[in-house]
Amino acid sequence: MAKKVAGQLKLQVKAGSANPSPPIGPALGQRGINIMEFCKAFNAATQEMEKGMPIPVVITYYQDKSFTFVMKQPPVSYFLKREAKVQAGSKTPGKAKAGSISKAQIRTIAEAKMKDLNAADIDGAMAMVEGSARSMGLEVTG
């Protein structure tokens, strides 16, 4: 007999640094999920990844207080900032430019994010990444 799902929870946690402090502790604690068990499992699963990389995670918790989690790719904005070598996007995206990014770099990001995006092909994924770049104030070149 399959376990009965009590709900799902979406969090964004930095790779290798899950700990019971907010926002993780309160979010899991109020649902009765074992916080330390999640932190240990998440840190073990992300130990090969770059430390501090934000990882979206979907936690499915069951009525017997057990849980499973699925990790996704980091957000597009993380990849864009890393590729363009900027700390943050522009505060006024239509007017001031924060940096520039090439079509080749956009293609690399789109290929990495393809399974998380709802795009039919790589061109659709590239268009989504390009839109994110423009909304961050990055200039798309080449």
Swiss-Prot record:
Q: What does this protein do?
A: Forms part of the ribosomal stalk which helps the ribosome interact with GTP-bound translation factors.
What do the Gene Ontology cellular component annotations say? cytosolic large ribosomal subunit
Q: Top-down, what is the taxonomic lineage of the species of origin?
A: Bacteria, Pseudomonadati, Pseudomonadota, Alphaproteobacteria, Hyphomicrobiales
Assembly and binders: Part of the ribosomal stalk of the 50S ribosomal subunit. Interacts with L10 and the large rRNA to form the base of the stalk. L10 forms an elongated spine to which L12 dimers bind in a sequential fashion forming a multimeric L10(L12)X complex.
Gene field: rplK
Post-translational modification here is noted as: One or more lysine residues are methylated.
Organism (species): Rhizobium meliloti (strain 1021) (Ensifer meliloti)
Q: What is this protein called?
A: Large ribosomal subunit protein uL11
Alphabetical GO biological process terms: translation
HAMAP family according to UniProt? Ribosomal_uL11 (MF_00736)
Its Gene Ontology molecular function terms?
A: large ribosomal subunit rRNA binding; structural constituent of ribosome
Give the family from UniProt.
Belongs to the universal ribosomal protein uL11 family.
Which keywords does this chain's UniProt record carry?
Methylation, Ribonucleoprotein, Ribosomal protein, RNA-binding, rRNA-binding
Pfam families (alphabetical): Ribosomal_L11, Ribosomal_L11_N
